[in-house]
């Protein structure tokens, strides 16, 4: 064997080792989730043992039970009729997104996130559904600022695009550069914004959202997937919304000193704490709580403790969304 042949084989083997050792999930892999409901370890690897699933440390899908139940469990927790009752006026003629957000798209998107509403007892699972739909209802509400029929908390999911975006939400980022002519304003149930969020989300769900950001307002299943991705994915120093609502997040001493304790209020802090938390009472936080209480009542579960973030300091840098 010649020297050049030996060198070529060595380089191929080296490439194989480097590529084969790439992390599989979490912040090391652009927010990707493990397949089959497996836990993502703090180092970005997928597995089902305590080394992968122990909290703190585990990044996502931290149930510790390996593959989670399929979406059939979700349909047993929230039926089509209940979904329609909760999002009562989403298809009203006054809502620009009427006809877009469907129950079928919600269930289909959940198949990509099998840990959603499958962890803990039935009350915990229903509470996660209520919290997810409440936060996203606030982001897409059509019931604020007027005497809405059936009250403001029956008007979630009225919008799928940000109103009058102040910019294109394009930041300099070598990993997720903006595509020419594309804008990354809020879209979908969670009103995902900024190119780096579109890039991370797209990588995790297998869709090129940097070049096709409008998919979040034209394809309802992909739109719901973007919201589930945000919900399930921790972005340091923030835990995931999922881990908070199922009780898998343990606040650090710094968190407690900042007033960040387990409960629905921390989820608001994760989503939009920089604008809404640590400022005392405000209408935005109250609106999020109002949706949550209504949905918990419909599902027949208690609210839990610490619903607001009025006295919580915001988290540091990480993924966030801008409210409409």
Curated annotation (Swiss-Prot):
Propeptide: 318-324
Taxonomic superkingdom: Eukaryota
Disulfide feature: 25-40, 34-46, 39-53, 58-62, 95-158, 170-178, 277-309
SUPFAM superfamilies per record: Lysozyme-like, Plant lectins/antimicrobial peptides
Keyword flag Disulfide bond: yes
Pfam families given in the database record: Chitin_bind_1, Glyco_hydro_19
Active-site annotation: 139 (proton donor)
Chain ranges of the Chitin-binding type-1 domain: 23-64
Chain segments annotated as transmembrane: none
InterPro entries membership: Chitin-bd_1, Chitin-binding_1_CS, Endochitinase-like_sf, Glyco_hydro_19, Glyco_hydro_19_cat, Lysozyme-like_dom_sf
Enzyme Commission identifier(s): 3.2.1.14
GO biological process annotation, one example: cell wall macromolecule catabolic process
Record's keyword annotation contains Metal-binding: no
Keywords: Carbohydrate metabolism, Chitin degradation, Chitin-binding, Disulfide bond, Glycosidase, Hydrolase, Plant defense, Polysaccharide degradation, Signal
Annotated catalysed reactions: Random endo-hydrolysis of N-acetyl-beta-D-glucosaminide (1->4)-beta-linkages in chitin and chitodextrins
GO molecular function, a single term: chitinase activity
PANTHER family for the chain: CHITINASE-RELATED, ENDOCHITINASE 1
Family: Belongs to the glycosyl hydrolase 19 family. Chitinase class I subfamily.
Protein name, entry field: Endochitinase 1
